[in-house]
Amino acid sequence: KKIINDAGVIVLSDAWLGGGFASKTKCIRNPNDAKGQVMRAAGKAFNQMLEGAGAGIQSMPSSEIYTGLQTGVLTGANTSSGSFVSYKIYEQVKCATPPGKFGLWFMYEPILMSKQNFEALNSKQQKALMKAGKVAEKYMTEQVANLDKKFEDAYRAAGVELAYMTAEDHAAWVEIAKKTSHKAFAEKVPGMALIHITT
């Protein structure tokens, strides 16, 4: 949040959306399953981790995953639960790994406002905005579980196999992340202690 603040922006509401994997070839539960796959991942840190697991990376927006899988440019992808459903990726894959109990991927989706605009408001308006932000945050937290369920339901209905990570699978990804994305993150942001707390 300090980085956001320093950029002249205020966070009105926090939200974290879950996501997972899908593949044309096999279920992706652990790093060994990603080895040799050509993946689209959501963000630099996840790219670093997948490369560390032996996957090839193709960068593209989530709106192009369907075509990437259809044309053979990709064998697998990582994106949010919502995108997995809205882009009908279930039409192109054999197996999907929803967040489940040991979700690996989360996307930060805050509601932001320019600090300059916020500070131009009077105290009453500022309080009202912050209160509305908390209401939005509570609502979004409740909806996240619904997005994950829609992901599972849509893929099950399409006949796609669903796979779930175990604690051991999750731990194997964390070990790869420590050598790749965590290391790169710590070089830019002094947050390694926080990463260790969460893993």
Give the label of every model feature segment.
Residues 2-199:
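N-terminal secretory/targeting leader peptides
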